[in-house]
Amino acid sequence: VKDGELKILVTPSKAFGKVIKMQLRAVREAHFLTFEDVDYKGDANMVGERNWSSLIDSQQYGGPLLYPKNNQLYNWSDANNTFLASELPNGWGDYQYWGGGHAISNYLDMDLTHGDFQHQLAVYYQDAKTGFGGHNGSKNFCVHYGYADNSGYANGPLPYIYFGDGVARVVDHMYVTMTTYLANCVANGNGLTAPAGKDDWVKLVAIGYDEDGKEVATRPEFYLVGAEGNILEWTKWDLSALGKVVKIDFNVTGSNDNGYGFSQPAYFAYDDVAVRF
């Protein structure tokens, strides 16, 4: 066995001297973070329920979970499965979603006129068979919001996922796509940003940290907007180049700048995160 690959030479008795070469690839065990209730394996979550759907806020903006008045920290954990977890970072001196974070969602909206912050948790995708917005026809997914750049206006902590048990593992991949808010602004712009032109781009960046808290060498990138077009369907983002990490920060950056830094909405949706075990 070498590099995860097993080669076997087989000479069947009726092959008349021919050698049949078979190549088998060893398959690593993987656990998947799907955000679907049927796959929830943890204890009670922050609202006392044992499912993912109870972590979806009742309002996309200003709701009681992501913008609490009681200082309750929005958080989630995929305990006893991938062990991935997340909570809102302290982006603006508090722990609310306007400072960034990763929010569970099942909202979808195919109407670009709704592409604003009031609909910030909606994905711009609807499965033709199920009618749901998640990857592979599923209901639930997660929405990232937050960024940092060199403008001096956005330099707070980035939203992140981490392994709640402190064990470093390889996050193999996740599936990503646009939110309705980003899709609208890329196509039409708004009061804060121009639409994306033919040479503009928006990309996602993953920043990994090892068990010693040191950043790993490689930063995988994924272009939501770029020369090859706009990503409007769930698409695989390979994160395996990070290697074994205990934490991953995510950033959204791009070429549009309104004089105050990156001006497109710093959102993306992700689903079906694969972790090697």
Identify the function of each model-found stretch.
Residues 166-173, 244-245:
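Extended extracellular/luminal ectodomain segments enriched in beta-structured repeat modules
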Residues 2-7:
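Short, solvent-exposed loop/turn segments enriched in Ser/Thr/Gly
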Residues 158-164:
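Short surface loop/edge beta-strand patches of beta-sandwich-type extracellular domains
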Residues 29-155, 166:
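N-terminal targeting leaders for non-cytosolic proteins
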Residues 12-16, 198-277:
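Terminal, low-complexity interaction segments
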Residues 185-204:
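Short coil-to-beta strand junction motifs in C2/discoidin
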Residues 18-28:
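C-terminal edge beta-strand
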